[in-house]
Amino acid sequence: MNSKFADELIATAKAIVAPGKGILAADESTNTIGARFKKINLENNEENRRAYRELLIGTGNGVNEFIGGIILYEETLYQKMADGRLFTDVLREQKIHIGIKVDKGVVPIPGTDGETSTQGLDGLAERCKKYYEAGARFAKWRAVLKIDLAKNCPSQLSITENAHTLARYAAICQENGLVPIVEPEILMDGNHTVEQSAEVTEKVLAAVFKALNDHHILLEGALLKPNMVVNGTDCPIKATSEQIGKFTVRTLQRTVPPALTGVVFLSGGQTEIEATANLNAMNVLPNRPWALSFSYGRALQASVISTWKGESANVEAARKVYLHRAKCNSLAQLGKYTGEESTGSASESLYVKDYKY
């Protein structure tokens, strides 16, 4: 890859996952944030979405020691604080890198059992240019795969198709100065064991990195956003944090080149505390040539939203909750998280069946 942006891409990727730092994924689509607001009986309109994102973006108090990047939805990229400052300017002042979700959602692959491919390659180069000009320095694209061993899912067709589109997206991003976050999410839905999850995740990641190599992706200027290796939600045997850490790190060791700067895990419907504890379990293990960090949406925001409740009087209390969760995950990224009291919302299941983002 001979992009004029090579040095910048490498520096950005390193900064996002510097020691103790990870990503806040705040790029929920309008429909998804609507579902979150519904839980607190809040109308899903542009002003409420703006106010909620101001709560997150306006959090100071050293949040930038824990958060290296924040992924925004396109609407948010152009929104402003109540005092008129652009969200992007506030983030730049805090030296938090700005990311943007660039995929257009999933569509079924014909001839499969409901398996999907991600749309959004058309016009992507132009959009990347526009986002770079608006201050974005990284992007995210989510592919979705599911495990159903009885139906032979994920099929080879689904794996190949999603690996290819992830690699095309990554190449277009790097050409235009954006660090690509490559996200092949294998959903938690199903009754598979943690061992079966490890086997499938290995197969998927091997295909993804073969495609990235075929497309000449600069791995030092890219980040991987995979699922942790966990058992299916309907599996009677629940894996421990230690097992999840061990199987996840082993899977990465077998498939991910050490040239890749970092791996930022999705929380995928784990509780807030599970997502933190499982990340910590990986970071106490040996032989990790990459930064292993977080790119959490629900697992950084669920308690924040339930504390806020849409009331301006609760903004500061909600920001304290956000800071606390960010700090816990920062400690986990360093392998120094020692646990915490499980308050109601922090240990509440965040699982949504067949999760659409």
UniProtKB/Swiss-Prot annotation:
Substrate binds at residues 49, 140. Its EC number is 4.1.2.13. The gene is fba. It is an enzyme of class 4 (lyase). Keywords: Glycolysis, Lyase, Schiff base. The keyword tRNA processing does not apply. It holds the Pfam family Glycolytic. GO terms for molecular function: fructose-bisphosphate aldolase activity. One of its GO terms (biological process) is fructose metabolic process. The lineage of its organism: Eukaryota, Amoebozoa, Evosea, Eumycetozoa, Dictyostelia. One of its GO terms (cellular component) is cytosol. Pathway: Carbohydrate degradation; glycolysis; D-glyceraldehyde 3-phosphate and glycerone phosphate from D-glucose: step 4/4. It catalyses: beta-D-fructose 1,6-bisphosphate = D-glyceraldehyde 3-phosphate + dihydroxyacetone phosphate. This is Fructose-bisphosphate aldolase. Belongs to the class I fructose-bisphosphate aldolase family.
